[in-house]
């Protein structure tokens, strides 16, 4: 358990303030945030863990209601393969149900990679390099935009994306 206040707190990578920004990218951990910043060269908000993301999104929506938000989830597939909940994906989907205008990006991870402990974009960076991270981010974001254009009420899921 944390000794300091965590709920609603976050760290920003790539900017000193949130004012005047055109979009927000939010993820769980620092290493993932640093990887996303390196891949996109855009501000990334590190939310500490999945349990804190909803409060951060709520705070940002209240203060910057017209600024688009993209939530970059962890894919805890290893837990799922053991019959447990995929906390990263489930949390992201719950947040997206509550705030339907946010986009969610979930890293594509094979069962074999999950078994080796790969669960987020930093793990993908360490195993496959920055080009794979960029490729996945661009591919998934493109399909999200295409899907929104074709059917604005449908949420794209990991299963909808094929290569």
Language-model segment annotations:
Residues 21-22, 35-163:
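TOPRIM fold recognition
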Residues 24-26:
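Conserved beta-strand elements of the Class I
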Residues 1-21:
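Glycine-/acidic-rich phosphate or pyrophosphate-binding loops and their flanking alpha/beta elements
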Residues 32:
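Catalytic-loop motifs flanking and including active-site residues across diverse enzymes
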């Amino acid at each position: 358990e944390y000794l300091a206040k965590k709920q609603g707190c976050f760290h920003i990578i790539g900017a000193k303030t949130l004012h005047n920004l055109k979009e927000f990218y939010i993820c769980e951990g620092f290493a993932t945030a640093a990887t996303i910043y390196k891949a996109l060269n855009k501000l990334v908000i590190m939310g500490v863990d999945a349990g804190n993301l909803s409060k951060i999104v709520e705070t940002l929506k209240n203060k910057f209601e017209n600024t688009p938000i993209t939530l970059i989830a962890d894919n805890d597939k290893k837990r799922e393969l053991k019959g447990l909940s995929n906390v990263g994906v489930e949390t992201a989907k719950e947040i997206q149900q509550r705030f339907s205008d946010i986009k969610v990006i979930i890293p594509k991870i094979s069962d074999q990679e999950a078994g080796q402990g790969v669960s987020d974009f930093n793990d993908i960076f360490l195993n496959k390099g920055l080009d794979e991270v960029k490729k996945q981010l661009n591919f998934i974001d493109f399909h999200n935009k295409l899907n929104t254009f074709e059917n604005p009420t449908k949420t794209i899921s990991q299963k909808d994306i094929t290569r």
